[in-house]
């Protein structure tokens, strides 16, 4: 029986693909070498230790229906669209070696006619007249007995959209965690016009088989049929949850301020594990009572726009005469934390 396994996803759902990756990684025999090929529709993928409010323009993402997905490996934030090809190499120890998987990808690119080289710990670059340009970034994860190397190749990604979502909105955040480093990038189509995802997958597959001297049939993974993977439903539910994608952010503080016709408002939030642990409100309003009550209500609240809005509007019962002010406040807060 071959020790190789080749899986190809026909889903563009980042939560589905990352759940498949997680299940395969946890359950594979330590003697197996796995290649998983996939791609995501419009998604910002953040590292395990990153803060989405700090890394991303979450409001713009929501407006444009761009998903957020937290991966289980470290590293920085990246934007995926269908112009990216994603790959994951997995192996048990001591066979796991990220230099091997890197060389397989480089061999695949070379077979396609692209001369690339490794740069630093995570990137593959090509030389252009304007200098080195990144075409691939990677991240890694290791446990006691296994490891994986996953990354992307830029084929024909919409590079103009990187700045739309990976530059945070102008929010006053003081946050802990990993900050993404922006790199100079280029698409492979600049070097190989017309190159497709399927051609790149075929080249990586051939290089994978050539390295190990074996071949196996590809397994197509599809959301149309629930993958036959133990605990997949639970893993997918976690991967797609707000608690994982947003709530796992490192502790941070958020300062919001706005001036309304009825007074200025300054909100100070401390947030841990997606919950507000401390809320302070400062105002020069002539009637500060609703705002003081709001500070108490927000303690322990999920740091989610709809939940904050709900707490604001709940105060209408106790302060009906301040309906206009509370509705303005509610709309502003909901927009500010998206």
From Swiss-Prot:
Can you say where in the cell this protein is located?
Answer: Cytoplasm
The record's subunit annotation is: Monomer.
Q: Report keywords, A-Z.
A: ATP-binding, Cytoplasm, Ligase, Nucleotide-binding
Q: Which family does it belong to?
A: Belongs to the LplA family.
Keyword Nucleotide-binding among record annotations: yes
Q: In which pathway does it act?
A: Protein modification; protein lipoylation via exogenous pathway; protein N(6)-(lipoyl)lysine from lipoate: step 1/2; Protein modification; protein lipoylation via exogenous pathway; protein N(6)-(lipoyl)lysine from lipoate: step 2/2
> Its catalytic activity?
L-lysyl-[lipoyl-carrier protein] + (R)-lipoate + ATP = N(6)-[(R)-lipoyl]-L-lysyl-[lipoyl-carrier protein] + AMP + diphosphate + H(+)
Amino acids binding ATP: 71, 76-79, 134
GO cellular component labels: cytosol
Main EC class of this protein?
ligase
Q: Does the keyword tRNA processing apply?
A: no
Q: What is its main location?
A: cytoplasm
User: PANTHER family, from UniProt?
Assistant: LIPOATE-PROTEIN LIGASE (PTHR12561), LIPOYLTRANSFERASE 1, MITOCHONDRIAL (PTHR12561:SF3)
Query: HAMAP family from the entry?
Result: LplA
Any extra remark in the record?
In the transfer reaction, the free carboxyl group of lipoic acid is attached via an amide linkage to the epsilon-amino group of a specific lysine residue of lipoyl domains of lipoate-dependent enzymes.
Q: What is this protein called?
A: Lipoate-protein ligase A
GO BP, one annotated term: protein modification process
Annotated binding of (R)-lipoate, by residue: 134
All copies of the BPL/LPL catalytic domain together span 29-216
Q: What does this protein do?
A: Catalyzes both the ATP-dependent activation of exogenously supplied lipoate to lipoyl-AMP and the transfer of the activated lipoyl onto the lipoyl domains of lipoate-dependent enzymes.
Native species:
Shigella sonnei (strain Ss046)
The record's GO molecular-function terms, alphabetically, read: ATP binding; lipoate-protein ligase activity; lipoyltransferase activity
Annotated EC: 6.3.1.20
């Amino acid at each position: 029986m071959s020790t190789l396994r080749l899986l190809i996803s026909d889903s563009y759902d980042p939560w589905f693909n990352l759940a498949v990756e997680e299940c395969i990684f946890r359950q594979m025999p330590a003697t197996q070498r796995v290649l998983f090929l996939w791609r995501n529709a419009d998604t910002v993928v953040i590292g395990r230790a990153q803060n989405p409010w700090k890394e991303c323009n979450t409001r713009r993402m929501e407006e444009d229906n761009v998903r957020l997905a937290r991966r289980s490996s470290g590293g920085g934030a990246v934007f995926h669209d269908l112009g990216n090809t994603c790959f994951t190499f997995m192996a048990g120890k001591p066979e796991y070696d990220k230099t091997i998987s890197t060389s397989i990808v480089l061999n695949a690119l070379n077979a396609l006619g692209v001369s690339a080289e490794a740069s630093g710990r995570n990137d593959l670059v090509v030389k252009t007249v304007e200098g080195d340009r990144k075409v691939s970034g990677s991240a890694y994860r290791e446990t006691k007995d296994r490891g994986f190397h996953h990354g992307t190749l830029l084929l024909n990604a919409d590079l103009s959209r990187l700045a739309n979502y990976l530059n945070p909105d102008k929010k006053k955040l003081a946050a802990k965690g990993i900050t993404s480093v922006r790199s100079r990038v280029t698409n492979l189509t600049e070097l190989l016009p017309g190159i497709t995802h399927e051609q790149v997958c075929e080249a990586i597959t051939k290089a994978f088989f050539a390295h190990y001297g074996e071949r196996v049939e590809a397994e197509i993974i599809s959301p149309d049929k629930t993958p036959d993977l133990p605990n997949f439903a639970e893993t997918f539910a976690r991967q797609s949850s707000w608690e994982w994608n947003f709530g796992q952010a490192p502790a941070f503080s958020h300062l919001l301020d706005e001036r309304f016709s009825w007074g200025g408002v300054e909100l100070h939030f401390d947030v841990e594990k997606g919950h507000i642990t401390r809320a302070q409100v400062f105002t020069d309003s002539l009637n500060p009572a609703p705002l003081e009550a709001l500070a108490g209500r927000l303690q322990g609240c999920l740091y989610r726009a709809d939940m904050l809005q709900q707490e604001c509007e709940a105060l209408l019962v106790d302060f009906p005469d301040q309906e206009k002010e509370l509705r303005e406040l509610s709309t502003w807060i909901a927009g500010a934390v998206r």
